[in-house]
């Protein structure tokens, strides 16, 4: 089972536990702006993700508004990952919280 956490809790996990934040939004939106340090998780990048993240590493899933990330978080749990989180409010919530982002502009 995955846990839902606030954007602030996600940022804290990234700092304190070196959690990996994966962004599942489309390529164009991810390239335009994303949470600082986010990994763009797609069907094509899943193999790279598996190499980078161990099953017990903390992984945080982010999408647009916090809905789609739940499905991906559940999928990762089914694949054997133990420490999975979904951001409440997604990237929109991350931005509203004023947390660090990286942009293409």
UniProtKB/Swiss-Prot annotation:
Record's protein name: Thiosulfate sulfurtransferase GlpE
Spans through the membrane: none
Catalysed transformations (reactions): thiosulfate + hydrogen cyanide = thiocyanate + sulfite + 2 H(+); thiosulfate + [thioredoxin]-dithiol = [thioredoxin]-disulfide + hydrogen sulfide + sulfite + 2 H(+)
Coiled coil: none
Cytoplasm in keyword set: yes
SUPFAM superfamilies: Rhodanese/Cell cycle control phosphatase (SSF52821)
Boundaries of every Rhodanese domain copy: 15-103
Keyword Transferase attached: yes
InterPro entries named in the record: GlpE_sulfurtransferase, Rhodanese-like_dom, Rhodanese-like_dom_sf, Thiosulf_sulfurTrfase
Species per Swiss-Prot/TrEMBL record: Mannheimia succiniciproducens (strain KCTC 0769BP / MBEL55E)
GO MF, one annotated term: thiosulfate-cyanide sulfurtransferase activity
EC numbers: 2.8.1.1
Gene3D superfamilies documented for this protein: Rhodanese-like domain (3.40.250.10)
Localisation per UniProt entry: Cytoplasm
Pfam family, one: Rhodanese
PROSITE patterns named in the record: RHODANESE_3 (PS50206)
Similarity comment text for this entry: Belongs to the GlpE family.
Active site positions: 63 (cysteine persulfide intermediate)
Gene Ontology biological-process annotations: glycerol metabolic process
GO cellular component: cytoplasm
Sorted UniProt keywords: Cytoplasm, Transferase
The protein's enzyme class: transferase
Functional summary from the UniProt entry: Transferase that catalyzes the transfer of sulfur from thiosulfate to thiophilic acceptors such as cyanide or dithiols. May function in a CysM-independent thiosulfate assimilation pathway by catalyzing the conversion of thiosulfate to sulfite, which can then be used for L-cysteine biosynthesis.
């Amino acid at each position: 089972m995955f846990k839902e956490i606030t954007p602030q809790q996600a940022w804290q996990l990234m700092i304190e536990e070196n959690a990996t934040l994966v962004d599942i939004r489309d390529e164009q939106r991810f390239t335009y702006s994303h949470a600082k340090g986010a990994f763009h998780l797609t069907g094509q990048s899943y193999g790279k993700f598996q190499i980078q993240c161990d099953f017990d590493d903390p992984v945080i899933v982010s999408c647009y508004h916090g809905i789609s990330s739940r499905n991906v978080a559940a999928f990762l749990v089914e694949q054997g990952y133990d420490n999975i989180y979904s951001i409440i409010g997604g990237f929109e919530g991350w931005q509203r919280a004023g947390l660090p982002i990286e942009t293409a502009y």
